[in-house]
Amino acid sequence: MKFKEFDKPEYFVNRELSWIKFDDRVLSEARDKNLPLFERMKFLSITSSNLDEFYMVRVASLKDQVHAGYKKTDIAGMTAKEQLKAISRQTHDLVHVQYSTLNRSLVPALEKAGLHVIFEHEAFSEKQKEFVDQYFEDNVYPVLTPMAMDSSRPFPLIRNKTLNIGALLSKKDTKKGKEEIDFATVQVPSVLPRVVIIPSEKKGHTTVTLLEQIIERNIDKLFLSYDVICAHPYRIMRNADLPIDEDEAEDLLVEIQKQLKKRQWGEVIRLEVEDKMDPRLLDILKMEFQVHGDDIFFINGPLDLTMLMKVYGIDGYDQFKEPKYKPAAVPAFQNDKDIFQVIREGDVFLHHPYMSFDPVVNFVRQAAKDPDVLAIKQTLYRVSGNSPIIAALAQAAENGKQVSVLVELKARFDEENNIVWAKMLEKAGCHVIYGLVGLKTHSKITLVVRREENGIRRYVHLATGNYNDSTAKLYTDCGIFTCDERFGEDATAVFNMLSGYSEPKRWNRLIVAPIWMKDRFVKMIEREAEHAKRGEEAHIAAKMNSLCDPEIIAALYYASSCGVRIDLLIRGICCLKVGIPGISENIHVRSIVGNFLEHSRIFYFRNGGSDEIYMGSADWMPRNLDRRVEIVFPVEDERIKEEIMHVLDLEFRDNVKAHILQPSGLYEKQDKRGKTLINSQMEFCREATERARAAKKEKKEKKRVFVPAEPAEDIIK
């Protein structure tokens, strides 16, 4: 490493513990009584979903390291075993706060709002008992598969993340003497709604319960020859980290399909049970799943809080939700010109979800239909369930255009979807590429090659986020349309590199990982340090999802020690420490957790007054810089530069949704007393709506202008 004096374990935060702090920031939104009630419930659901993925991937990976006897320490000087111990302590605390928030704050508040939630079937009224028993007979009983365990029937395979009910049974006709206890389990069917609306005791109220409570109440109907001693829900989390040997795999698609099946049956790494579970039932689960100690979570409430999103979706409670924001039209496209003409007139900046994602979809759609378009090339990492972009690409191939699509099969938890899309695109006649061996392709780029009067012209869309029309309404991302030939040449080179083995001798504008992106960033950070040493103004501002690359962090420490002012917007993991005397006193870190998920990557360097701005798909993480194909691109249009600087400025001034990293390692919200409240996300919504409205008004006024049918001088003559 270049900056060895800054490469000490005490200067870094462990990646996993930093992630837990991020989930804690999400949880703090659920606890914020200034938020609408249903939004708080949504954030609580998100913390649960986040924690599931964290265990299936990150904790699973650490457990693999322990099993393999791996003793090497991480950048913070912790072994895998030490990390697991610290993770366990902090995640148990997190889960405790989750359920305290649910039981003590949200459930009573929901009751006041007219939504009664019954989490225990013992609380049903007689009328409700009658309803749920009939509901069980009509809708649930035919779907259930009770599974017993005895000498002829081994313990059943329990699928990852499924909710199950375990029961202890005793035969009804057992003679007096020692009671024989049997075990049985039944999976709560995921094909049925987990949140069930039942008759309410109060007029004007809605009452809901959970499917597992209906099953638990009626479980004796599944075991007619037995007495049910006890029945309790449980849930397991398995290792879902896919080990794929790409060098050995003859067909990557087939290999991933094989591994996906194994994901359901990986090692059990976490067991969630009701805190009142019968110890005898718990002992059976512990033995069968080989789970002990801290890997067992005793839950004071319903298991798997992701179901709160279903409660969020119940009709009639809009007054307890944030008003739904409709992405505004993009002013540049609010005219009757075709999309290619608009791009020829100048680069176009998009800021989602404040601006609509429609121009990106229309770009591919129009290219698919345009007889002058010869080729379309695109990278796809995560796409929506019914993707209009996939449909347009398929149509383009059917229309005889050359269509090349890189579908990243290794996009975690989207592998199955991407396999389906890859097969569909191939069937339509597209050239489908699965990426480079050993590297995930995470870059976001589309190239359209069009025949025009002056010859071939290349149109490029570059972005920080996925080509996913669904998440584009929920994630904050930036993108640019351009037909600058230098970008076009580089885009062609990227696709040639992905589809063949050709790497260009030089790149005009794009910075590509893993080739030289990290080196380029380090050089730009060093350049700021040199400016600072000469007494010139030196400033770095960067926005990303996560920061954990040790070389980049060491370079930032070096720049800070030279006097460079460094402002960082890091939504998630941050392994950098602020406030280390003489090292990171000039570094300020904030994290925005709001209604939209902050996802864009923006990098600003003062460069002695010749400002440079870059955007792209890469975070400052080893996986992005060393193990993925990523693209970062410069922003050269002065008008767009101003817009991006406004984005950064507003987010650095946010005092409503921003959490500030302290030297202690804790994140704290700003003291807002006596200050004008700035919620950057709300402000961007307002600005985008106003701009779209102004552009629409201008278009109407242009149409009203009287244009003589003949030149004025001809009329006078």
Residue locations for each model-derived region?
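N-terminal localization/anchoring segments of enzymes in phospholipid and broader phosphate metabolism
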Residues: M1-I540, Y558, C562, C574-K717
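Cofactor-pocket helix-loop regions in the catalytic cores of large enzyme subunits
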Residues: N545
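A generic "binding-loop/recognition-motif" signal
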Residues: C548, G572
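Glycine/threonine-rich ATP-lid/beta-loop region of ATP-binding domains
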Residues: P550-I553, Y557
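Hydrophobic alpha/beta core scaffold segments
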Residues: R565-L569
